[in-house]
Amino acid sequence: MVFMANKKKTKGKKTRRPTKAEIERQRAIQRMITALVLTIILFFGIIRLGIFGITVYNVIRFMVGSLAYLFIAATLIYLYFFKWLRKKDSLVAGFLIASLGLLIEWHAYLFSMPILKDKEILRSTARLIVSDLMQFKITVFAGGGMLGALIYKPIAFLFSNIGAYMIGVLFIILGLFLMSSLEVYDIVEFIRAFKNKVAEKHEQNKKERFAKREMKKAIAEQERIERQKAEEEAYLASVNVDPETGEILEDQAEDNLDDALPPEVSETSTPVFEPEILAYETSPQNDPLPVEPTIYLEDYDSPIPNMRENDEEMVYDLDDDVDDSDIENVDFTPKTTLVYKLPTIDLFAPDKPKNQSKEKDLVRKNIRVLEETFRSFGIDVKVERAEIGPSVTKYEIKPAVGVRVNRISNLSDDLALALAAKDVRIEAPIPGKSLIGIEVPNSEIATVSFRELWEQSDANPENLLEVPLGKAVNGNARSFNLARMPHLLVAGSTGSGKSVAVNGIISSILMKARPDQVKFMMIDPKMVELSVYNDIPHLLIPVVTNPRKASKALQKVVDEMENRYELFSKIGVRNIAGYNTKVEEFNASSEQKQIPLPLIVVIVDELADLMMVASKEVEDAIIRLGQKARAAGIHMILATQRPSVDVISGLIKANVPSRIAFAVSSGTDSRTILDENGAEKLLGRGDMLFKPIDENHPVRLQGSFISDDDVERIVGFIKDQAEADYDDAFDPGEVSETDNGSGGGGGVPESDPLFEEAKGLVLETQKASASMIQRRLSVGFNRATRLMEELEAAGVIGPAEGTKPRKVLMTPTPSE
């Protein structure tokens, strides 16, 4: 027992484990003591006090060379501000990278000295510093120390000393960039702004040079006119007329001419008087025509065989009241081309400055939100880049290996919620890239003006039907060539920008094409969208506003297409380009000039109205034009605000392969237009999806805005130069209110041949139903229904009353 008691007494007390606060306090004390000791040691090294201070400094020099002071300062900052620096990862990383660059630069400078050139790097560096260390001196430049030598040696071996300088500079720039608050987007934006500034300066210099050339031409022309006027006055002053006979005394005139002419004018100068015709350019001919004067609108003497008779009427006699004295001084040789000046971009309102600086901060924030949102759903992605467009910003994300694409595409609603966006469109994947695009609407939509788009587009002026359509998400202007489409369907809900886009396409063509190169046929059942273009010389006929006339006008275009194909067959060419080439070759070698064929663009602003009135005729004409009109130089632009299957039928879609979809209300409408979803997520106001014939996926564009004032200015400019010259061959003529063709859907239809028989049957049985007529007369259900409608219109039977049978309003007469 005593032994047990002694054993219990010898057992010590159980030690208590320190708390976290106590451990942290102990660590803080240790850090404080360490920092204080290092500070004292580094202080002696900084001031090089005594042998100890010099030795400390030389030890640091051995590691980092002559950058010792920089690293001493960096060490002291880290000792006392390490908590703050832990939150600044980019600052620390940038400093380390910039320090590596400085070490390379210092060592490259050291070994560019003649005394160390071509010496072994590590051994020479160590010998320099160890010599000072052993002698307790600081005498020589140490470059980047042993650390700098280790980095410099492979770089100098691979890239030489000069290459090491360049790599060091790159490291320093990269380090400073990481230390700053700048982002990659800021650098890209700066480069883009600088590029735009240089381009604007170049364009301004180009305009100034053009203005100087024009001024020189004007001065030269003025001098020529003054010189010619002086010659004429000198000639008239030298002429002596016999008062009795009225004849010119040539001998005396020749004597007086030398005295009257100015000193710089000699007898061998240019002809005394040449008639100047302002409206046309004259073609060189030897002799004037010895016939009554005629004026040619173009350089065409006779039409090509088998052309329409309308094209032969190219010559107009002068009025009888023309003064003969004026005719004697006019050269009536055929004229090459009508002097027609194309409209300039100055007719359009200048661009308004756009400020999207707020979008940059929002983009940086959205990048973090996107990555965090995907991470919360267990999807590992990385945002590769972001492109700020006029209306949306496109984020290109790269999913990790093994992530299914549909997992990302199914999160559109969740992403819209996280980004507080109106809607989000996901393009999975981006065509041609191993990335997925997420399009988020901007907080402020930047309007793209027609002038801005025209100036930035790279459309070829020789391609008359190549027009700029809009700006892509990356800000680049996109153009399309209607000749390659070859037809275009434009659809979207009311107010989405459909009519503005059509006006932009028309204005683009008017900016490039003369009236003899492109002709328009415009159909506008709404009466307000295209009526502004009335009376321009590019129109074949006035803008058609009557839907019943429109179907006949389309049939006229079909007839023109057939006529052109017959002409191509007889000439032996395949398309309009080959035909016009033949015409140019013939005109170059013959005095009789022939007429090239213009391109024809048919524009329908509201297809739904036409389909309601005369669906069969309109659909047949559109299908025939869609199948064959491309080679004949005829192209269609069909616009509608009701993208339903009864308006855009399958046959129309098959023959109009290029489509533009503006904002629609549902995915069904989007599939009707594009055969895929996406248009229901558009923002309106010109935001569109463009799907050309040669691309499998639509491209999102922001269409240009062209105001009514801009359209009126360009139309007024064109009307001031030439008047409308309508072609009667395309005139649909007058159409009665009840005339809608055989397949229309309105008006009073023609009487069915079985109408009287059906009427007698109803009066005899005093019963009226479509099934009875179908059974008794052996007709189809559709025809029986039409007969019932005719009987109702004739007052034989009453209207339908739900499930009740129709009332027979007439009774049979004894004769019946």
UniProtKB/Swiss-Prot annotation:
This is DNA translocase FtsK. Residues 475-671 form the FtsK domain. ATP binds at G495, S496, G497, K498, S499, V500. Essential cell division protein that coordinates cell division and chromosome segregation. The N-terminus is involved in assembly of the cell-division machinery. The C-terminus functions as a DNA motor that moves dsDNA in an ATP-dependent manner towards the difSL recombination site, which is located within the replication terminus region. Required for activation of the XerS recombinase, allowing activation of chromosome unlinking by recombination. GO terms for cellular component: plasma membrane. The chain crosses the membrane at residues 35-57, 62-84, 91-113, 128-150, 157-179. Homohexamer. Forms a ring that surrounds DNA. Residues 726-737 have a biased composition (Acidic residues). Residues 180-816 are cytoplasmic. Keywords: ATP-binding, Cell cycle, Cell division, Cell membrane, Chromosome partition, DNA-binding, Membrane, Nucleotide-binding, Transmembrane, Transmembrane helix. Its main location: membrane. The lineage of its organism: Bacteria, Bacillati, Bacillota, Bacilli, Lactobacillales. Consists of an N-terminal domain, which is sufficient for the localization to the septal ring and is required for cell division, followed by a linker domain, and a C-terminal domain, which forms the translocation motor involved in chromosome segregation. The C-terminal domain can be further subdivided into alpha, beta and gamma subdomains. The alpha and beta subdomains form the DNA pump, and the gamma subdomain is a regulatory subdomain. It comes from Streptococcus agalactiae serotype III (strain NEM316). It is found in: Cell membrane. Belongs to the FtsK/SpoIIIE/SftA family. It is a multi-pass membrane protein. GO terms for molecular function: ATP binding; ATP hydrolysis activity; DNA binding. Residues 1-18 have a biased composition (Basic residues). Gene3D superfamilies: 3.30.980.40, P-loop containing nucleotide triphosphate hydrolases, Winged helix-like DNA-binding domain superfamily/Winged helix DNA-binding domain. One of its GO terms (biological process) is cell division. Residues 1-20, 726-752 are annotated as: Disordered.
